[in-house]
Amino acid sequence: MQDAVPRLTFTLRDEERLMMKIGVFVPIGNNGWLISTHAPQYMPTFELNKAIVQKAEHYHFDFALSMIKLRGFGGKTEFWDHNLESFTLMAGLAAVTSRIQIYATAATLTLPPAIVARMAATIDSISGGRFGVNLVTGWQKPEYEQMGIWPGDDYFSRRYDYLTEYVQVLRDLWGTGKSDFKGDFFTMNDCRVSPQPSVPMKVICAGQSDAGMAFSAQYADFNFCFGKGVNTPTAFAPTAARMKQAAEQTGRDVGSYVLFMVIADETDDAARAKWEHYKAGADEEALSWLTEQSQKDTRSGTDTNVRQMADPTSAVNINMGTLVGSYASVARMLDEVASVPGAEGVLLTFDDFLSGIETFGERIQPLMQCRAHLPVLTQEVA
């Protein structure tokens, strides 16, 4: 029997204000986001991600994002030791979808901005204007050291200076097709990119440090942040408030999109049992690697994404916000997320992506006031 959970009620004006976008964080790396021997074990493939994103599109998800990971954490589960590449994956997914927005992640230490500008313009053409770029500076030193391109530990304190120049080159090339930018990190000499994107290219970021938020406030279209805790859907509110305040300083509208994992079942008890089972199988060796790497950056402060990921409180799913409960409970908590000022959307992961998206679309989303504007589905995706 499904737990009885009160349905939130809003006036029409509140309902309009609380409309929230939903995205899926596709599993580009093995095993998704659960570092556990008890979680589903699988390799990343194009076919898996195609099925996930096509289901997400069917259920009116607004966007799909893939990360980039160049070296994993090892351990019994070989966590994230097996990864696809973000731009090529999303190019393929752009070709087999028609409405959902598609975002790839650029590891900016590995790709010159002019190459990213051209790749993005290409996927813009494939997708019909549905593509955007997530820019990351890089925090896991071994990812880059293995290729001989780690610039030294001083980079930790200068990475947003680097990213600022990077995005300025991108904006030049996407906006005018030409760049003569001269900076400390990049020198463009009549650099050209054509054709240009058919629509303004969206840039997103995931800054939680002061420097990261300042960058997003100046250059990003929206900023990702971690949800916090288990079944505490509004605990991220101070982070969203900081982002809102940073954006006010630049006079731009930069909303927060919040990362959550959904573990749902018919009842709260059944969902909680799954969560406890995953925690009991935590891959301690892989988690130790994460903790070790999080301590390498001694220059960016204590409020970075990786510090939160490695917190022992819930490291089994890298400490993203976790919503555990019945379908009605999860719907209620997501409506609470939507009520937080500055929260414009959520980026969701699931313990099992294919069944998770289906149950979300069939059992959770129809109960959400912040998704009440969606049309009723009339047919099932294959």
Swiss-Prot record:
GO terms for molecular function: alkanesulfonate monooxygenase activity; uracil oxygenase activity. Pfam families: Bac_luciferase (PF00296). It catalyses: uracil + FMNH2 + NADH + O2 = (Z)-3-ureidoacrylate + FMN + NAD(+) + H2O + H(+); thymine + FMNH2 + NADH + O2 = (Z)-2-methylureidoacrylate + FMN + NAD(+) + H2O + H(+). GO terms for biological process: alkanesulfonate catabolic process; nitrogen utilization; uracil catabolic process. FMN binds at I68, K69, N134, E143, R159, Y160, S209. The keyword Repressor does not apply. InterPro entries: Luciferase-like_dom (IPR011251), Luciferase-like_sf (IPR036661), Pyrimidine_monooxygenase_RutA (IPR019914), SsuD_RutA_monooxygenase (IPR050172). Gene3D superfamilies: Luciferase-like domain. It comes from the Bacteria. Its EC number is 1.14.99.46. The FMN-N(5)-oxide reacts spontaneously with NADH to produce FMN. Requires the flavin reductase RutF to regenerate FMN in vivo. HAMAP family: RutA. This is Pyrimidine monooxygenase RutA.
